[in-house]
């Protein structure tokens, strides 16, 4: 009788769905209050003036204006601020 040996099993074959993280509004772009600026895990970018921080570390605009990225402080942290238009 013709036989074929059974194939082995594997623990691979899955992948998680991408989370679409990253900068959503870049420096110089106009934003409205409530617009999401950055989606991130942890505080790669910190909230500056007129920017709110969500519970998942999402940065969002608190007022209308232009987005500005800057490096400040002794630890050279990246801050996102909104300058009033």
Curated annotation (Swiss-Prot):
InterPro entries: Ribosomal_bL27, Ribosomal_bL27_CS. The keyword Zinc does not apply. PROSITE patterns: RIBOSOMAL_L27. It comes from the Bacteria. This is Large ribosomal subunit protein bL27. Residues 1-22 are annotated as: Disordered. PANTHER family: LARGE RIBOSOMAL SUBUNIT PROTEIN BL27M, RIBOSOMAL PROTEIN L27. Keywords: Ribonucleoprotein, Ribosomal protein.
